[in-house]
Amino acid sequence: MARKTNTRKRRVKKNIESGIAHIRSTFNNTIVTITDVHGNAISWSSAGALGFKGSRKSTPFAAQMAAEAAAKASMEHGMKTVEVNVKGPGAGREAAIRALQAAGLEITAIKDVTPVPHNGCRPPKRRRV
């Protein structure tokens, strides 16, 4: 029987000038996904994927590092300008936006797309620490 050669598909370098940076900032983590204008993912990163564990994932510094990593990966595909969609109540919202700008991406618009219920599900009980 012929042996299969273990070949991995190489990433194709796309040439995309502008896109959308989706920042999902929760109380536990920050996920940054950079897509083209149609919503196809070009690069992504998160605080957890960079090795932050536990409560360190929810820090603004972790969000900054995640945004930098995603921005660098997208700039390899020719990305220059991004619109930013921010979702969630987390600590890393502003830090991630600043990191995208510092990495060299030009930010054209910032939108808050946090879903707000029209009085839907009951929220979790308040924490008593």
Swiss-Prot record:
InterPro entries to which the protein is assigned, alphabetical: Ribosomal_uS11, Ribosomal_uS11_bac-type, Ribosomal_uS11_CS, Ribosomal_uS11_sf
Any Gene Ontology CC annotation: ribosome
Domain of life: Bacteria
This protein's UniProt keywords: Ribonucleoprotein, Ribosomal protein, RNA-binding, rRNA-binding
Molecular function GO labels: rRNA binding; structural constituent of ribosome
SUPFAM superfamilies assigned: Translational machinery components
Pfam families: Ribosomal_S11
GO BP term, pick one: translation
Entry function: Located on the platform of the 30S subunit, it bridges several disparate RNA helices of the 16S rRNA. Forms part of the Shine-Dalgarno cleft in the 70S ribosome.
Quaternary data: Part of the 30S ribosomal subunit. Interacts with proteins S7 and S18. Binds to IF-3.
Family per similarity comment: Belongs to the universal ribosomal protein uS11 family.
HAMAP family for this protein: Ribosomal_uS11
Protein name as catalogued: Small ribosomal subunit protein uS11
Species the sequence originates in: Anoxybacillus flavithermus (strain DSM 21510 / WK1)
